[in-house]
Amino acid sequence: MSDQLEASIKNILEQKTLKWIFVGGKGGVGKTTCSCSLAAQLSKVRERVLLISTDPAHNISDAFSQKFTKTPTLVEGFKNLFAMEIDSNPNGEGVEMGNIEEMLQNAAQNEGGSGGFSMGKDFLQSFAGGLPGIDEAMSFGEMIKLIDSLDFDVVVFDTAPTGHTLRLLQFPTLLEKVFTKILSLQGMFGPMMNQFGGMFGMGGGSMNEMIEKMTTTLESVKKMNAQFKDPNCTTFVCVCIAEFLSLYETERLIQELSKQGIDTHNIIVNQLLFPDTDANGTVSCRKCASRQAIQSKYLTDIDELYEDFHVVKLPLLEAEVRGGPAILQFSERMVDPEANKN
């Protein structure tokens, strides 16, 4: 259609206010190659770029043929692109927001009553043992605070498959609710503030010190939460392939991001086949022709479903994209749609 948005990531490169960019989708669609390529392009227009892998598989080391750790490391061949790998889900278990909200509601209902202290103990015990994802949420919060202090212009997240990523993006909201409620009930929890502080990795100290630390942390979390839900600061790039399951999961991802108030207006359709033809326009490889026909069907669906998105269509290449020069070359395809016709 004539008013179709440009099939490139130029809109992201031109939006200088962006601070956090998440790249995600179903497993096996090429998220890492796309996130590395996006970071490479951003390094051309921004002063300091950080690429973070939150995927337990940590494929960015393989993509750049360079070992990365938990410390930001300069990517070979670049002057301003750094990369790091973190384990954002050590236990493989997620936070149940419904359980959190139920406990907070119960604690509020019992505030000031005869069962207040008992409920406080139950609340603490539930956090200590019943929600294995709370330490993960705290680690993520501390990581964001640390990254924010390192003065990078923009941060690109190479995320794990969809379900894990959606939990990751819930953490700021989760932490804000938890700390707001704990501080509002500090009269009831006063005798146990040291235990709360230890549980949230804040060390020992007096009740006033614990309250001060929690208040400071809450302010940081509120800032993080506001930024994640601000389209001027944060966006999510969905990566998929032109197949039913991948398209289905992409739609689910976009719906969930919308519910969480997180902006997304870019989709990358990866691994597309453009088979060679003879002088008569016939494709010599029957399997290639069949696969192309399937992909063409889902590309039509994507164009109809996401007409208000920038949809980048990338080809399946003959060789792997590995190493800085190869990633930089591949990244040009995300900027120039004409390059994907070759």
Curated annotation (Swiss-Prot):
Binding residue positions for ATP: 26-33, 243, 270
GO cellular component: axon; GET complex; neuronal cell body
CDD domains assigned: ArsA (cd02035)
Active-site residue list: 55
One Pfam short name: ArsA_ATPase
Compartments reported by the entry: Cytoplasm; Endoplasmic reticulum
Positions that bind Zn(2+): 285, 288
S-S bridge residues: none
Entry keyword annotation includes Endoplasmic reticulum: yes
Enzyme Commission code: 3.6.-.-
Gene Ontology molecular function, alphabetical: ATP binding; ATP hydrolysis activity; metal ion binding
SUPFAM superfamilies for the chain: P-loop containing nucleoside triphosphate hydrolases (SSF52540)
Keywords: ATP-binding, Cytoplasm, Endoplasmic reticulum, Hydrolase, Metal-binding, Nucleotide-binding, Transport, Zinc
Keyword ATP-binding part of the UniProt annotation: yes
Enzyme class: hydrolase
An annotated GO BP: positive regulation of insulin secretion
Broad class of the protein's primary localization: cytoplasm
InterPro entries assigned to the protein according to its UniProt record, in alphabetical order: Anion-transp_ATPase-like_dom, ATPase_ArsA/GET3, ATPase_ArsA/GET3_euk, P-loop_NTPase
PANTHER family: ARSENICAL PUMP-DRIVING ATPASE ARSENITE-TRANSLOCATING ATPASE, ATPASE GET3
Family: Belongs to the arsA ATPase family.
Functional summary from the UniProt entry: ATPase required for the post-translational delivery of tail-anchored (TA) proteins to the endoplasmic reticulum. Recognizes and selectively binds the transmembrane domain of TA proteins in the cytosol. This complex then targets to the endoplasmic reticulum by membrane-bound receptors, where the tail-anchored protein is released for insertion. This process is regulated by ATP binding and hydrolysis. ATP binding drives the homodimer towards the closed dimer state, facilitating recognition of newly synthesized TA membrane proteins. ATP hydrolysis is required for insertion.
Subunit structure: Homodimer.
Name of this protein: ATPase asna-1
